[in-house]
Structures are given as structure tokens and as C-alpha cells.
């Protein structure tokens, strides 16, 4: 989506999002942990900003809504993912965690419906990881997506823009925009509870409190509908649905053409072979014609014979 103000006005709620999963995109990962932290626009606008060096980490808003869930995946976590997140498929299952299912989608919908609208999801590296993965998980389900009508932005793009605006010349070095690197650059300390969904969401919130007014303006201009996000990879349900629809349309079209009703063009109906001819019984008129001709011939012969007998010399 281009840089333009949304027609419905300002985003009223920012929902900071983080997912933990079984691995990298190439491994077709599944979600193992999810955290959403909903903050009203007013709470961000009223963030108290200190100019100290180093600046203190801003306190999170007092009024927030939070949803944090651990989720049992359908596949094993990669060793690297388990080491970083501290989660494994076996441990999640033994503690009775449930799959990413329709009930979770209903829970997400209820959470979002409680927030002032419009809402915008904010995730770090969201465009490349969190949003496509979340879209993939939702595509597996039979229920409609709870995120229809919700917007989203990637905080990496936002923070790059804010940093470049604050120091256009830069320092000539290439900066890292990982969540931990930005946090350390701003507040001169490492974030706590990294690679837990809730810990990363709180870290992201603290970063976005650095320049809240500029951030909100950027979000208003760059938010895009979550429905435009493409899934990270195809799922059996999604693939089956996608493949079946064209086949169904193709099958219906020739059937409708072959069976064309009177309201449709009759000229398109296949021509049927002409019916076999059945010998017809001779009609009465057909019999009278030869009989009349025979009678005339008989009379003519009798007349000629009578004239012959009556001629002289016979």
C-alpha cells in the first residue's frame, strides 16, 4: 500500500503482535506461541518521554488488553527453535496445550471485537514472518478469518523511517534492525525475556514509545488490510480449495452448454442425427390414381376395337 492517509481516519488501536514457531519459513513452520497486546492510540500519545542519556525505558501504558497463548504444533520444533524459545512439541502436548484451531480463531475474533476500531497489528519483521505465518494458520481453519477488517504494519519499516528522519545524514555505518539491536541502540541496555512472545511484544512496545507521535502518523499512512497478506506457504485445505474451484467451473460450463435450455441459444445445442425413415403405408389417394388410369386405357381399347369391327369389308 502506498504512503497515503486511510480514508476512514486514524487507527484507534495498535495491537502489538509476536509469534514463536517451530522454525524458519523454509521449514513450513507452525505457531507455538502467540501474544497480542492492544494499546489505545491515546495511551501512546500520552507517553512521557525523557531526554536523559541514556533515556529510561518508558513505562508501558496502564490500560492494555493482552492475549497470550501457547499452542501445540502439528510438527516437531527444529532444534534451533527449541533452544531459542524454550518450547518443544512434546512439552506443549504433555502440558495439554491445544492446536491452532477454530476455537482459537473465535478467541481472536472476540479479543479484536473488544478493541476500538479500526485496529492495526504491529509486528517486527511482520511482513516477512509473523503476518504470512498467521495467515497460513488461519487458512487451515473452516471458520472465516477473524482478521478481516484489521490492518497491519511492519515495525522494521516504521523504525527505519523514524531513525532516518531523526538523523538524515546517518553515521555511515550499516545498522541492524533486529528487535534487540534497536532496543539496545535506543535505551543502552539489552531487552529482557527475548524470544518469548510476551517478552518480544513488550520490547516492541517500548521501542514504539520512543517517538509515539511520529510512529502513529507513519502507521496511519502505511497501514494495509491484513486480508492482502499472502500465506507463507500453501496448506492442504487451501490448496484443495484453490484447485477444486477451477475444475468445478470448467465442468459446469460444458454441462450447461450441452443441456442448453430454451432460454439459451438453441444454435449451440449439438445436432442430433436425423431419425431413420420408416416405410409408410400407401394412402387411399395413392391407390386410386393407378386404377383410374387403367380404366381409361380399357375404355380406349374397347372403343378402338368397336370401330375396327364396324369398318367396311369386315
From Swiss-Prot:
Mg(2+) 1 binds at residues 18, 20, 200. Induction: Induced by cytosolic DNA. Induced by inflammatory stimuli in a cell-specific fashion. Up-regulated by IFN-alpha and IFN-gamma in B-cells and by LPS and viral and bacterial DNA (via Toll-like receptor signaling) in dendritic cells and macrophages. Changing residue 200 to N: Reduces activity. Loss of endogenous retroelement metabolization. Mg(2+) 2 binds at residue 18. Substrate binds at residues 20-21, 129, 200. Its main location: nucleus. Residues 237-284 are annotated as: Disordered. It is a peripheral membrane protein. This is Three-prime repair exonuclease 1. Keywords: Cytoplasm, Endoplasmic reticulum, Exonuclease, Hydrolase, Magnesium, Membrane, Metal-binding, Nuclease, Nucleus, Phosphoprotein, Ubl conjugation. Belongs to the exonuclease superfamily. TREX family.
Amino acid at each position: 500500500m502506498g504512503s497515503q492517509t486511510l480514508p476512514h481516519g486514524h487507527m484507534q488501536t495498535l495491537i502489538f503482535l509476536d509469534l514463536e514457531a517451530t522454525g524458519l519459513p523454509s521449514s513450513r513452520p507452525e505457531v507455538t506461541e502467540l501474544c497480542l497486546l492492544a494499546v489505545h492510540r491515546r495511551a501512546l500519545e500520552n507517553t512521557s518521554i525523557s531526554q536523559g542519556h541514556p533515556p529510561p525505558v518508558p513505562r508501558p501504558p496502564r490500560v492494555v488488553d493482552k492475549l497470550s497463548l501457547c499452542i501445540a504444533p502439528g510438527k516437531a520444533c527444529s532444534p534451533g527453535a527449541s533452544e531459542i524459545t524454550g518450547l518443544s512439541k512434546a512439552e506443549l502436548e504433555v502440558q495439554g496445550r491445544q492446536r491452532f484451531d477454530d476455537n482459537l480463531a473465535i478467541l481472536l475474533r472476540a479479543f479484536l471485537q473488544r478493541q476500538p476500531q479500526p485496529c492495526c497489528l504491529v509486528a517486527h519483521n511482520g511482513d516477512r514472518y509473523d503476518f504470512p505465518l498467521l495467515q497460513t494458520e488461519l487458512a487451515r481453519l473452516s471458520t472465516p478469518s477473524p482478521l478481516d477488517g484489521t490492518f497491519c504494519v511492519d515495525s522494521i519499516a516504521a523504525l527505519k523511517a523514524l531513525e532516518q528522519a531523526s538523523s538524515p545524514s546517518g553515521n555511515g555505518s550499516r545498522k541492524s534492525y533486529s528487535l534487540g539491536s534497536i532496543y539496545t541502540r535506543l535505551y543502552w541496555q539489552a531487552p529482557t525475556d527475548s524470544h518469548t512472545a510476551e517478552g518480544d511484544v513488550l520490547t516492541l512496545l517500548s521501542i514504539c514509545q520512543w517517538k509515539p507521535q511520529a510512529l502513529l502518523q507513519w502507521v496511519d499512512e502505511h497501514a494495509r488490510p491484513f486480508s492482502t497478506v499472502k500465506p507463507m506457504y500453501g496448506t492442504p485445505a487451501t490448496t484443495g480449495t484453490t484447485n477444486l474451484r477451477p475444475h468445478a467451473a470448467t465442468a459446469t460450463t460444458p454441462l450447461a452448454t450441452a443441456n442448453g435450455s430454451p432460454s439459451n441459444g438453441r444454435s449451440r445445442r449439438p445436432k442430433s442425427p436425423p431419425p431413420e425413415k420408416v416405410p409408410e403405408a400407401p394412402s387411399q389417394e395413392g391407390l386410386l390414381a393407378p386404377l383410374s388410369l387403367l380404366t381409361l386405357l380399357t375404355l380406349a381399347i374397347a372403343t378402338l376395337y368397336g370401330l375396327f369391327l364396324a369398318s367396311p369389308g369386315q
